[in-house]
């Protein structure tokens, strides 16, 4: 009986096992034979991703539409998150970097600014700030207690290698640092399967080919195309153009609400910064299907990117190049004539601003020394570019990154004398025919002042009227009538003409400073004295103005009292050609009499057209009349072996003004040393380099004086 029951159980179990096995066989047949192909395809897991289409930045062009900043297409390398383990990610990164390096490509990383290698040290963003260093260390640690372990850069390096990124001992320290660079960006900027991280831009086609050929080694690595910024004739336009760069953490915090991402680029200086809202495009999107390795299998749909707006400047490219070339050439020439008495061979920098007197358009804006903005487009691991940037940053003597045209503040010297004359004329202190007898010296407020020619043993100017005083730049004339006019009235007119006041130009500008009672009290905590007025009246003492203010000032002299807002942006257009913005000339009318302007014009014409004029040599045989003024302000360091600065202002044609020019050369020795620079600019503007000029460019007879 028991044996029969046992046999029954055995048969039952056998039947059950047979049924289970049969089910398995049926399923296998179904999976592998009947639906094998379909199931094989489904086994390749598919992901749907939303990928960004990067919009091209708007171009920047000159007034004639000649591009200065444009774009080209370049390949980028991105990493999307996959299921790779940490050791596999690290190995993949080092393989990618080796490909980059073999083809001369650079890769991106924010770590360069915080931790460097060879030597291992803190980067430029934290090496001079204990507060920034502590904040950074707190942000990067896994546990708060770990901060106490990070006392040196070497500690941070070890922490990153061993704890944070678990980098295998088989890698050298240099290889480990390279892995850290990419892993750091993965950590800080974040990346997911649907939001890949860009690790390299504008890579060589060889890099693209090698990555694609070995795609099985690089799961999640994507190749895409993005517009890359390109600068044309970059050094000539550097200070106007500026450059773009990756968002800093501070910029990102301020801009993320506007849709910016941490790995985006933004205008950092110049028009790139000033016109950021115009130039930035709107990124598009595409929905794609990818396999588990991140390879694209299908593009489902897309929303195209909208390019940024194109910005057209008031700058004329040819005029800009002439201004830059002439500025550099004349600085070298001044330097070469060192006599180590007055000229100490230290001329090294300067600026030129040319302005349309009838609408405020800036026609040229040159600042020297210049820099190459293209180096700021390179990757952070581009050693040559980083070296160049470091040179620019550390050049405290020449400061090439400073736009002297809007940020340089210079004592004006004698180019200020027309303002003193305007104040004296408008306030009824003098007429154009009021005579001053220059005996070579005078005592004002207990201080003795000398005529420059008298001091140089050439004899004083004797009797002079306004025209002669401007032509010969007689200090004694302006000392005397400046004191009689008074500092308050002189300062009032200087302010009306925009000196020591922001001009409103699009670029970041210095305000400058005017010599007056308030300024002296604030700077020196001292009362004003008559001798202070005497010095201020000839453009010395606390007076300090930017070249763009000086160009604006001479423009007002030229057009008879219209103070325009200087501007660099002429027009903004959409990619389809429709106009987004068009500059409309704005001006304030200065309440100055026509007779006053005429008297100043006569004196400034005499500067360039009389035998005794301080710029007569430069404009001898010039085919039309130029109204001008030279300035040789003292810096206070002449006794220490430093040359005086040199300044020059002009407008032309004097009888029908079109253009105003202001020139500054630091340590340029004499004001008339800068006149050839203005002459070159005027020649180019009026087409004289091709020996063509129009009927309104008519020469006048030489002005002659009688004493």
Where are these regions (language model features)?
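Extracytoplasmic/secreted cell-surface and envelope-processing proteins
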Residues: 87-88, 232, 374, 478-479, ...
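Active-site catalytic microenvironments for nucleophilic, acid-base chemistry
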Residues: 99, 329, 333, 426-428, ...
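Surface-exposed patches in mature extracellular/periplasmic domains of secreted proteins
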Residues: 104-114, 222-227, 334-353, 433-435, ...
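Short, gly/Ser/Thr-rich active-site loops of penicillin-recognizing serine hydrolases
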Residues: 578-585, 679-707
